[in-house]
């Protein structure tokens, strides 16, 4: 039993911000003295089941995380989405909250293996952002309010528009390593093509503006890779935040994100098209980081001086966008 409590306390420490006094927080939460808290932290006194429930609820720790004592068991937190507008607002809030959570810890870094276009990029380009949020909610979540409408007829809920800049701004502040392959934009291009062929656009100008935003994303990624810094295309401004990019010829297989710092880590695995499930499990994080490092070692650097490789990589993706553009123009 003591081993489980030791494991739980270590998990608790990894789940709290460094500026928080854990002992004082627990004292207030459990309504016990600091001395009683320290006895629990030193495993001299057992943490009761009711106290465990209260702690897990307060610090957003799943009870299943106690299984971390067994390296073959992993607990995940998911964003439970429905077909309501409020549900997607919560998705954006969680996205923003998780990035802010990692920002609290020293030497934070984000590694993103992108089977699909990293979600953050959409939010810098309004036409593409509108399309993707409509696609996710209409076609994936089956939102009733969006059915039977074309893109031009849809107005996004104000709560979505309020959250998008928050996610965008925090992303610009986090040092990032991205792994792309030739198919990273393929799904977005296919989704746009499907909506065009299905009659969900009233005007060619709408889809052409979305394709122009895809060009803009490639320009943004190119500028970031060339300078090794984050870039905001809205303000045409570079940030002194590290950015590196790799082109991978291997099949990535799934969107995989690893948030790391000196003291805290979290892994995110994509599911249901655009959603993510998160784990703070130490063993899973070690495995995930090892896989990502291996993918990087087998990839081609596209940042800074790798101009030839960078140009070749993006040229092929530009060609895929232009192919759909010509199809629309000739239709």
Model region roles, listed by residue range:
Residues 7, 25, 36, 87-90, ...:
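Exposed alpha-helical structural elements
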Residues 138-309, 313:
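Hydrophobic protein-protein interaction segments
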Residues 89-116, 176-205, 331:
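Short N-terminal signal/transit or membrane-insertion segments
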Residues 320, 324-331:
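Long, charge-rich alpha-helical interaction segments
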Residues 1-79:
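Basic, Lys/Arg-rich alpha-helical nucleic-acid-recognition elements, primarily the DNA-binding modules
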Residues 71-149:
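Helix-turn-helix/homeodomain-like alpha-helical modules used for DNA recognition
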Residues 2, 16, 89, 204-211:
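Generic detection of long, well-ordered alpha-helical segments
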């Amino acid at each position: 039993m003591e081993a489980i409590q030791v494991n739980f306390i270590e998990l608790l420490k990894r789940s709290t911000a460094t500026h928080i006094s854990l002992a004082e927080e627990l004292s207030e939460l459990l309504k016990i003295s600091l001395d009683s808290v320290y006895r629990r932290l030193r495993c001299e006194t057992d943490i009761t089941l009711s106290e465990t429930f209260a702690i897990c609820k307060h610090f957003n720790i799943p009870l299943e995380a106690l299984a971390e004592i067994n390296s073959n068991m992993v607990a995940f937190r998911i964003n439970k989405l429905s077909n309501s507008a409020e549900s997607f607002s919560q998705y954006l809030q969680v996205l923003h909250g998780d990035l802010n959570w990692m920002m609290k810890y020293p030497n934070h870094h984000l590694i993103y293996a992108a089977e699909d276009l990293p979600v953050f990029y959409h939010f810098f380009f309004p036409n593409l952002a509108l399309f993707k949020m409509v696609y996710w909610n209409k076609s994936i979540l089956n939102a009733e309010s969006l059915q039977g409408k074309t893109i031009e007829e849809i107005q996004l809920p104000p709560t979505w528009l309020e959250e998008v800049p928050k996610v965008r701004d925090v992303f610009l502040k986090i040092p990032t390593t991205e792994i792309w392959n030739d198919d990273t934009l393929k799904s977005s291009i296919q989704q746009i093509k499907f909506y065009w062929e299905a009659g969900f656009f009233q005007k060619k100008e709408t889809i052409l503006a979305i394709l122009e935003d895809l060009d803009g994303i490639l320009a943004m990624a190119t500028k970031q890779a060339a300078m090794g810094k984050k870039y905001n295309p809205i303000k045409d401004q570079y940030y002194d935040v590290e950015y590196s990019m790799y082109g991978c010829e291997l099949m990535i297989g799934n969107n995989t994100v690893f948030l790391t710092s000196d003291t805290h880590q979290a892994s995110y695995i994509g599911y249901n098209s655009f959603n993510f499930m998160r784990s703070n499990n130490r063993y899973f994080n070690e495995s995930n980081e090892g896989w990502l490092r291996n993918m990087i070692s087998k990839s081609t650097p596209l940042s800074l001086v790798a101009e030839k490789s960078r140009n070749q990589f993006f040229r092929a993706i530009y060609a895929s966008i232009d192919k759909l553009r010509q199809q629309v123009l000739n239709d």
